[in-house]
Regions:
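Single, functionally critical "micro-switch" positions that shape active/binding sites
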Residues: 8, 96, 170
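Short alpha-helical interface patches
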Residues: 21, 25, 73, 123-126
């Protein structure tokens, strides 16, 4: 079986390599390693993410951490929440641009500093291997919608009045990016937005989530030409 602890995160095929039992133990090990009492966590649009998130948070709460769940978000929204609300720890359930059968966990300490193979992940792995399987019990977390605050933060870097009317094509790849885009660009009515694949769907039915692959950009490229858009 492949090792799930990588150089920069935890990642594997679900459920063969990464499952809910392992996510629970990782949650406990993470809090035990950092020795903190608060955590913010989010998850992406993959089909396995909600269940892995619940299991991970069951582990963090079992270690006594007050846990805030911001739900389905992009990784940038989790990073924003960790820094803006001064949490001492954060976690994102995501496999980034990997194929649908994968999932993973990004672990971060305060000031949005990620744990890696050179800083923290080996210690979390050592603790993880000592923790027994998950017991049954209620999940006690606090839910929070952070999209409005995230949008205000993003827009604080620009002068909205200086934005010229444009036609823009956006492809969210059926991930969580469409949610943060809608929250932000709702405040820029001078832009005409053409939305592609904005409905979160962990099957990634239209193309894969990795935008570096040319075949995953063909749809947006064609739409930019079709709409006569300024950019995409």
């Amino acid at each position: 079986m492949a090792e799930i602890f990588k150089a920069y995160d935890i990642r594997g095929i679900v459920p063969e390599e990464l499952d809910e039992e392992k996510a629970y133990r990782i949650g406990r090990a993470f809090i035990r390693y950092l020795n903190v009492d608060r955590l913010v966590s989010g998850y992406d649009a993959r089909l396995s993410s909600p269940a892995l998130s619940c299991a991970f948070l069951a582990g963090t709460t079992a270690e006594g951490a007050q846990t805030t769940d911001i739900g389905l978000v992009g990784t940038s929204v989790l990073y924003f929440s960790l820094g803006a609300f001064q949490f001492p720890a954060g976690a994102m359930i995501t496999a980034s641009h990997n194929p649908p059968q994968y999932n993973g966990i990004k672990l971060l300490r305060e000031k949005v500093m990620p744990l890696s193979g050179e800083s923290g992940l080996p210690e979390v792995e050592a603790l993880y291997r000592q923790i027994p399987s998950a017991p049954s019990g209620p999940l006690r977390v606090t839910s929070r919608d952070v999209y409005a605050e995230y949008a205000r933060h993003v827009l604080s870097f620009i002068d909205p009045a200086a934005v010229h009317p444009m036609k823009v094509v956006m492809d969210a790849s059926n991930g969580a990016a469409g949610l943060e885009a809608d929250a932000t660009f709702a405040h820029l009515p001078m832009l005409t937005i053409f939305r592609l694949n904005f409905t979160p769907d962990g099957h990634f039915p239209n193309h894969g989530p990795n935008p570096e692959l040319p075949e995953n950009r063909s749809q947006i490229a064609a739409e930019v030409l079709r709409q006569g858009a300024d950019l995409g």
